[in-house]
Amino acid sequence: ASVSAQNLTLEKGDNIAFVGSGFADRQQHHGHFETLIHQAFPEHQLVVRNLGFSGDEVGVKPHRSDEVAGVDYFLNMKPGALTTTVGKTEVTYHAGAHFHANVIFAYWGFNESFAGAAGLDTFKANLDGWLKKTLATDNGKGKVRVVLFSPIAHEDLKSPDFDAKLAADNNKNLALYTA
């Protein structure tokens, strides 16, 4: 999929989902960004769900366990019970409300960067496939809009255990995986 920088316009009633690894996950615990979104658009009645998990990678079935459904289920939920077999386990999910993500904030690349230059082609192919599939999706609120967030750099937080060489190596890999 071709990617170009554009301005994101949020519309009244948009359902926003955060997906990806640790950067998205941490925003469940530190909701500053979500708060700013609601503050900037108080009349929009936005619904935000954070589906990020530190172990997730693009192209790898998110949710690190065979006993948990993939993120696609959570992006397009309908009220009621869904019983499905995931891996070797029968699981019943109970959704209390509709949620049809039409804006997705995607935080991919950090976990994948640990594969270094050798993993870059796989990451690009997985991201391209995910984008094509996601951008072609209509969860009942029109075509999905995606915002890609680049992984953040390894910073010196002034810890006595800080390893400058490790940080420099990590940042070289992160730069490869950053748009």
Language-model-detected regions and their locations in the chain:
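Mature N-terminal, pre-catalytic/accessory segment of carbohydrate-active enzymes
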Residues: 8-16
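Catalytic nucleophile-elbow at a beta strand-turn-alpha helix junction centered on a G-D-S/GDSL motif
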Residues: 15-29, 54-58
